[in-house]
Amino acid sequence: MSNRRNFLKILGTGMAAATANPVLAGVSRLKTDHRTLKIGLLSPQSNLFPAYPYSFINGFRLGIDQHQALRKKQIEIITEQVGYGTPFLSTQAARKLLYENNVDLMTGILGTEVVSQFSDLFQQKEVPFIVCNPGEYFPVEPLRKNPFLFFNTLNLYQSSFLQARYATTHYGKKGLIVTSLYDSGYDAVYAFTHGAEMEEGTTEVVILRQGTADTVSEALSRIRSTAPDYVYALLSGDLAREFILRFRNEENSSLPLMATPFVTEEHFLTTLGASAAGIETIAPWSRHLDHPASLDFVKNYRETTRSNPDMMAMLGYETGLLTYRALASCNGDFSGTSLAHALREARMTSPRGDFSFDPETGWAQTPMYLTSIRAGLFNLTPEPHPEVLPQSIAAHDLAFAALDTPLRSGWLNPYLFV
């Protein structure tokens, strides 16, 4: 435990900054002079996590409906479906919202690499676009330089980088990454490997093959033969569930197990049961966070939807709240330039803590949390226990410079939206 505290101290100075202000401190009411502002929203689908698209929309509506802005028809949300977020469907939907619906601002869940294929539309039309996704890709320079693009993500590749540094300094220099062809098709593998290297650690990668009966057995055999100091499970869906259950139950392994933040989602933990206890991750948010902005959000979301919020609900709510604040601060000037300036200057306390955009890149800056999953009371489902990392790492940090290249490959859909 002392090592854990030392790691937190090394990364920063405490949680006070993340809880300093109530959510709506200093926010003026939106005044539209009887005009209805149009917000375009791109929504993909997911077979892995079918609830995620609806969670995001529910959260967004809750966040943007400050002072009953939707019910008063000050704001209208126009939603376009984009399938799995392919370039063709996404471009068609974006063009429709921009040129037929004439939206004032766009948001939604879309892969960063797909956005890069039609990012010039937003500069031509002078309409801000708040891109949301799990944070699977590094922001290449053309995206960072577009004054009408803003990115609010769940920081997946930063999480992987920080997890590697944590694991290497706490458990040993030799790590094993267990992933799949799908899960490895983004920047998280590189980020984890590079994070370990920065702490003079090494990593090996085992790729599980979906639909192959003995693929998990092969991975477990590899773990036994290589004897790593820790394992990082960069997996999702059924493959993640099978690997974790067998890793814990068949091997009775006491090896430290790191995983992606999405393992901490309630619907996933219930399928793992006691096998989830002891998993560690670095997550963007947890509904178990004990600070006012998060507690208020969880309460309001439950009252509105009769369900607990997941990470996508939080991301949607945060984006909706951000959008309302930006609109309200424009003082009636809803031009794209005015809105982009309002977003770039935005400062607020969201459910995950202090929120702002990096003024040079348009990428959200938010806290992250070292999260351990502990056994539930009376053998109930294990619960995440988050501790703030007072310093995160910027999306465009020099540690990721090797990713800043137009010669990129990988999946185009947002992570988990497949």
Per-segment meaning from a language model:
Residues M1, V23-P44:
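C-terminal segment of N-terminal export signals and the immediately downstream linker at the start
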Residues N6-V27:
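N-terminal export signals
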Residues G40-G59, E80-P87, G185, P309-A313:
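Extracytoplasmic "Venus flytrap"
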Residues I57-T79:
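Signal peptide-proximal N-terminal region
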Residues D104-V206, P256-A274:
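Extracytoplasmic ligand/sensor domains, especially the bilobed periplasmic-binding protein
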Residues F122, V189-I282:
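Extracellular/periplasmic bilobed ligand-binding domains
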Residues R246-Y317, S329-C330, A395-L403, L407-Y415:
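Extracellular/periplasmic periplasmic-binding protein-like sensory domains
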Residues P351-V418:
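Solvent-exposed, acidic/polar segments of extracytosolic/periplasmic ligand-binding ectodomains
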